C-alpha cells in the first residue's frame, strides 16, 4: 500500500517522523513535500496529496499543517477526495468505515506524533463498510463536486434530515 503524505513548513519534522513510522511498518510512502522549514503554503501540499490519491498514484493520503484545518480544506477541493480532519481514533475509523475517507488530516501542533501514528495505522487498517446507506450519503457528498442546480435547492438534504428526525441515525 502506498501512502501519500504532505505538510507545510510548520510541521515538517512531524511529517518526517510519521513518514519514518509508515516506512518502518512496511508501507510505501510518497512524500510530496514540503521538505524543510522554509515558509510555504499548505494548499500546495494538500493539493499534491489529493491529486496523488485521486489519480491512483497513492492508495491513501495524510495531510498535516499546524492546526490541520487549512491543509484539510485544500485537499478536500480535489475531486474524488474525502478527507477527514481528526485527532482521535474514533473519528478516523468512522471516516474510513462509514464515509470511505481516502485522506486523513491532522494538526501537527494539536495532535502529538505518537498518537498521530497510532491513529493513522488504525485508519489504514479500517475497512469501508459498503452498504446502501453509506453509498447513498457518499454519492450525495460526491455530487457536491459538480455545480448542479439541485444543490441550490434548500431541500437538498431534507431526506437525511427527516431520517434524523425519525431517529434513524444513532450517535
Swiss-Prot record:
Recite the UniProt keywords alphabetically.
Isomerase, Lactose metabolism
Can the keyword Isomerase be found in this entry's annotation? yes
- Gene3D superfamilies given for it? Sugar-phosphate isomerase, RpiB/LacA/LacB
By its UniProt entry, which InterPro entries does this protein fall under? LacB, RpiB_LacA_LacB, RpiB_LacA_LacB_sf
- Documented EC number(s): 5.3.1.26
> Among its keywords, does the record have Isomerase?
yes
GO molecular function terms attached to this record:
galactose-6-phosphate isomerase activity; ribose-5-phosphate isomerase activity
Pathway linked to the protein:
Carbohydrate metabolism; D-galactose 6-phosphate degradation; D-tagatose 6-phosphate from D-galactose 6-phosphate: step 1/1
Listed under catalytic activity are:
aldehydo-D-galactose 6-phosphate = keto-D-tagatose 6-phosphate
A GO biological-process term: galactose catabolic process
The EC class name is isomerase
> What does the subunit section of this Swiss-Prot or TrEMBL entry state?
Heteromultimeric protein consisting of LacA and LacB.
Family per similarity comment: Belongs to the LacAB/RpiB family.
Q: What is this protein called?
A: Galactose-6-phosphate isomerase subunit LacB
Q: Which organism is it from?
A: Clostridium perfringens (strain 13 / Type A)
